[in-house]
Regions:
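Hydrophobic, well-ordered beta-alpha structural blocks that scaffold small-molecule cofactor pockets
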Residues: 1-48
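Short active-site oxyanion
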Residues: 2-5, 27-28, 53-56, 83-85, ...
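Short, conserved structural micro-motifs that define repeat-unit consensus positions
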Residues: 3, 7-16, 98, 110-123, ...
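Glycine-rich hexapeptide-repeat left-handed beta-helix
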Residues: 127, 136-139, 144-237, 245-246
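Phosphate-bearing ligand-interacting subdomains
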Residues: 17, 35-95
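Hydrophobic, well-structured mid-protein blocks that either form specific transmembrane helices
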Residues: 74-132
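Short amphipathic alpha-helical segments
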Residues: 17-19, 67-71, 119, 190-191, ...
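Short alpha-helical
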Residues: 11, 63-64, 184
Length: 246
């Protein structure tokens, strides 16, 4: 594989860099909107993604990762540049030969993906997570460290299974939902909710991954006026780093 670019100069990006390096693949550079960031994990940080390929979007928040992929695809199409998304799988991960893994997806150290499981595009199967036989995980999902998803379960696009959560077999978890850390999921979960506990129960109809974010984030890769976005989470809020928008 050619050298890879990582969009997102972040802690998550550092882990992906290590995974690629463990496979003998060099990270050519990071890409990030924050013009104040010029180095990450010993690699330079670029501020324009135009013409850079192959790429992995190294952003942990599902909704932002999806937005960035969409704008990279749109930018490449408008400028006539080829764009390929790479996949990163740690050498210690155990992947069934019959499993399918989509482009842009990252599988971290110690993860297990069993027979006939399907992992969508731009997903994260994090450290020590397991996805068992015949599961279907939609695009832009995140299976957090130590989470266990039992056989035959379907997880909708953009959903987040929290650290150490357990999901019993043959359930359906809707799209854009968040399962809290340590939860035990024993029944289906609808779209767009936050749910946690043992047993796991829906607590709100707004997923905590529904980040309040100005749509301008989708319109540029570097340059323009600086804005500060507010991330809202249950019982807390925190301000993101500043990013560059048109």
């Amino acid at each position: 594989m050619a050298n890879v670019y990582l969009f997102g100069a972040s802690g998550h990006g550092k882990v992906i860099k290590d995974i690629l390096n463990a496979n003998g693949i060099k990270v050519e550079a990071f890409v990030d909107d924050n013009l104040r960031v010029n180095e990450c994990a010993g690699r330079k940080v670029l501020h324009d993604a135009g013409g850079l390929s192959p790429m992995i979007v190294s952003i942990g928040v599902n909704r932002i990762r999806r937005m960035v992929v969409d704008r990279l695809v749109a930018k490449a199409g408008a400028e006539g540049h080829p764009l390929e998304f790479a996949t990163a799988i740690h050498p210690s991960a155990i992947i069934s030969p019959s499993a399918k893994i989509g482009e842009g997806t990252v599988v971290m150290a110690g993860a297990v993906i069993n027979a006939d499981a399907v992992i969508g595009k731009h997903c994260i199967v994090n450290t020590g997570a397991t996805v068992d036989h015949d599961c279907v995980v939609g695009d832009y999902c995140h299976i957090a460290p130590g989470a266990n998803v039992s056989g035959g379960t379907h997880i909708g696009e953009g959903s987040w299974i929290g650290v150490g959560a357990c999901v019993i077999q043959c359930l359906n978890i809707g799209k854009d939902s968040m399962i809290g850390a340590g939860s035990v999921v024993v029944k289906d979960i609808p779209d767009g909710v936050t749910a946690y506990g043992n047993p796991c129960k829906v607590t709100t109809n707004k997923s905590t991954d529904n980040i309040m974010i100005n749509s301008n984030l989708t319109q540029s890769v570097g340059g323009g006026k600086e804005k500060l976005f507010l991330f809202e989470m249950p019982a807390m809020s925190f301000r993101s780093r500043s990013v560059k928008t048109a």
